[in-house]
């Protein structure tokens, strides 16, 4: 006897074409290349060449010129001198390189108006066929703006907790908050169409609940950050671990890693002395929640703590020799955090047990209704 209580899945031939063009519309609008522009692709040997060809195709259709510069891997930690003249002459940059967001030269180019698309999550053209690839980019932007509204326009504290006992906080001044939210990503601008923009494709990896843009990219600025996070997982580990492993911070630096298992010992060797450089959140409801490779889950409410390590790590070099990030970095993951913004007079919950509360913001629900059923769009992965 068999039971059929749910609708069978749609045959691919019924949905494939419409899904493809839906994703292509996102793709062509995010890559907002203009006639006559100079486009530079910062590539690596493991990038699907069809991705490069897709960008070239858009550029050719719009009368733009493309150059491709390749390094031996994505694990470029500083902009190579040989690439700088090409970068200086470009209007639009597509990059797989790790240094894209933090390198001072790259930051300076964006300050001059250069537009960037980072493709950490678009290394294979077949990703256009995923639910994440066709999810409306404007709706991702609405979710991000709703999250930004939960950050008070005042001095406040972001407080973390979870069932494992995490107790971690970051103190924000109004100036820090305004610095962080000023970028195109926190304004929900998902298209690479405004001067100085930096967008992720597939959308979206981040924006971050904290990074050094809150301090105007001053790496020496003190950070009011303290407490312990008990991550549930990390990139480079097959599955979430069962042990309660704690990472205690003083400022942005990890000063203690607790736990007795082999995993805890690996993390202790790896993480002690490491500095938090970004605390990212996912915002695309169709991103797979339990896919944390290569840099953390992009599902709403999934968090990744990006740690720059004190030294290259042997474990990373052994288990991920071709990782897109260098062995001086690690992304810790939580999938069930509660995060609240707290002022002297109020507190507001951004995440509730790993659920991004912005998904039920009235403005987000209204925006989702334009594209279909808000519950199906915002609270399912398929």
Predicted segments with their positions:
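Conserved active-site beta-strand-loop modules that form the wall/rim of enzyme catalytic pockets
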Residues: 243-247, 253-256
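Internal helix-turn-beta structural module
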Residues: 292-372
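Structured core elements
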Residues: 230, 246-248, 304-306
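Active-site bordering "gate/hinge" segments
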Residues: 1-238, 242, 250, 270, ...
